Amino acid sequence: MTQGMYYIISETTEDRFDEVESLEEALRIARDVVKESQAGDPVSIEHNGRVIRQFVLTPDGEVEEEPVQ
């Protein structure tokens, strides 16, 4: 992983969907990816080796941000 990059990762499958240089772009991509996921499967944004944001699709089709542990 390159320092300073933001990585969009499925926490369920551990697939890496993309890597980008800006948080804004990472947020957009993560929300798009989670919309295509199954309800309850978290999609995370990692930066400098840490999960900084996490999103999940609710059963009613809404994207929600979850607290990062």
Predicted features and spans:
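Short, mixed-charge low-complexity intrinsically disordered segments
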Residues: 36-69
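Compositionally biased, intrinsically disordered low-complexity regions enriched in proline and serine
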Residues: 7-8, 18, 48, 56
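Amphipathic alpha-helical interaction segments
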Residues: 14-15, 25, 63
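A short, charged, amphipathic alpha-helix used as a generic interaction element across diverse proteins
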Residues: 10-11, 20-42
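N-terminal targeting leader peptides, primarily classical Sec-type signal peptides for secretion
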Residues: 1-5, 30-34, 49, 69
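A general secondary-structure boundary signal
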Residues: 7, 22, 65-67
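Surface-exposed loop/edge segments in extracytoplasmic proteins
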Residues: 13-20, 51-53
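Short aromatic-glycine-(Arg/Gly/Cys) micro-motifs in beta-strand/loop hairpins
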Residues: 1-16
